[in-house]
Amino acid sequence: MNKRTRCLVAGTALLIGVSMALALILTAPQSARAAGTVRYAAPNGLTTGNCDGSWANACTLQRALAVAVSGDEIWVKEGVHYPGATRTAAFALKNGVAVYGGFAGTETQRSQRNWQTHRTILSGDIDKNDITDGGVVTTTANIKGSNAYHVISSTNVISTAVLDGFFITAGQANGSWPHSDGGGMYNYKNSSPTLMNLTFSGNAAAKGGGMLNNNGSSPTLMSVTFISNTATANGGGMLNYLNSSPVLTNVTFSGNSAVNGGGMFNNIGNPTLTNVTFSGNSADSGGGMYNVESSPTLMGVTLSSNKANGDGGGMFNDYSDLTLTNVTFSGNSAEYGGGMCNAHSNPTLTSVTFISNTAIASGGGIFNYDDSRPTLAEVTFSGNSADYGGGMSNENSSPTLTNVTFRGNSAVTNGGGMDNYADSRPTLTNVTFSANTADYGGGMSNENSSPTLINVTFIRNTAGNAGGMFNESYSNPTLMNVTFSSNSAIADGGGMYNHLSSSPVLTDVTFSGNSAGKGGGMYNNNVCTPTLVNVIVWGNNAATGPEFLNNNSTPRISYSDIRGCGGSGSWNSACGTNGGGNIDADPRFVNASAGNLRLLPTSPCIDAGKNGAVPAGITTDLDGRPRFADVPFVPDTGNGTSPIVDMGAYEAQYRYRVFLPLVVRNR
């Protein structure tokens, strides 16, 4: 076990069970149903008859369901309705039958109902001794005695089975299977009812406290709320199992709890979520959502203030490859992965925000381990915190990041923005680390890890050591088109600190305006041999070694501009090994004090680099402009065939116009 070994929560394939579902809806689709009879139900209705004609003939809801046939509607009067007298009783949905709540008991048209004003409650409190708020159980601790195992059930029904406008409460699935699952609703064997305008409150089960969907059950949920439901195992709000793929739109999971998946638990389930909120849910792992061998799709989803005692405050993924677009993780907390935790998982994140999430151990925003390889594009990490990796922590994992920002994240120990550990090899393109803080590696920390950085900016990061980047224990990152500016360290390495046989390779990198006690630009300690080609180190500050400082380390430097190293003609061997082509001259930045590290037309760094050092496939600079651009009238002092690459992260793009004199001749 290493010093930061994670413990994978019990249960990567833990779920056998039957499923339950809950939902809230607006109006049911009518074109798919043939016109039929309107049947009426009331809390103290008749137990015989056809329940039709008028409200005067209203039956119990159980009776109305029994006599209804495909094409019928059941209008249900406000009040509390119970499924029967025994624990196995449940309201069973039927194909082609639409059940509507929210009636006062006088309406002649369905459009006259108001399900929010006229609360229609389906309750499992068959012994009528629960503590309720107007008939609704608001916490499962208020369930007393023995309630119905399932308030609602469906087996092999399709979308024409409709439930619309109800509170579902007080289900208590604490028996043996199948009565252990789906306290509020239990959907089984390819059941896919339509569920609208529903609130599931105070239901309990071993699995799927609010709803359980099992064996290909894929209900459609619109305007549904799951609140204060609990599961002693998995899925406090909802559990989806064995190819169950419900579709959720405008759904809220709030205050639900479980051992795993406080809001939702998916095991071989692939739900689609649009405009869904997970808020204030809790679990040992996966406070908001827990996925096992599942591939849910999330669009416009918010996970906020969810909590996990172990992994994944907002979400935990195990062997799962989900897709997230326009998703926000905010204020979630856990031991590992405050926002998201991935184990053996490869989610795709696009336009996702992680803000103010916290982890006690690693990964305030995201924690990746066990060879996880998520893909992130247009993602922002802001204000997240952890012991290791305030924004992101990777353990033996290699995510791919494009157009990502780490801003204002913090770590107590390593990696304010990102911490890489145990042979992690992330790839970063067009990434910015700004104003992150840590003890080691304000922007990034690498331990026995070798990320690849292309077009990356480190600016105004702070640390005790290594303001911008910390590399230790055989870490060999590759950097191309990277800037380190205005980073600071109290002790060593304002821009970069390399320690214990770490040898990064830097090509077209600029260090300027960084500060530290020792090694303002770069500090190399304990047998480090970094390679620098086409690099500028100028205008940094430290009491000892303002630009560059080596302790028992020998960098290899060529075609670079390092202040104080003398250039290749009068090389200072304390700087490292002279590979030729080096200069020691003011690079003439456009405005270094303002952070503009582009080159003025008179810069000696223009056309002074080495073409052969630029890796294949790198054709642009940090601005996205051509990497090889010739500036007319500037001598090529570098190595290669014109156009010669510039030193530093930015390629000068100047062009000159030649104006010929105007000659006027008289005729």
Placement of each model-derived feature along the sequence:
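Sec-dependent, cleavable N-terminal signal peptides
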Residues: 1-36
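Extracellular repeat-rich scaffold modules on cell surfaces
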Residues: 154, 162-170, 177-203, 483, ...
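Low-complexity, Pro/Thr/Ser/Gly/Ala-rich linker/spacer regions in secreted
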Residues: 28-37, 650-667
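Right-handed parallel beta-helix/beta-spiral solenoid domain characteristic of secreted/periplasmic
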Residues: 97-177, 581-592
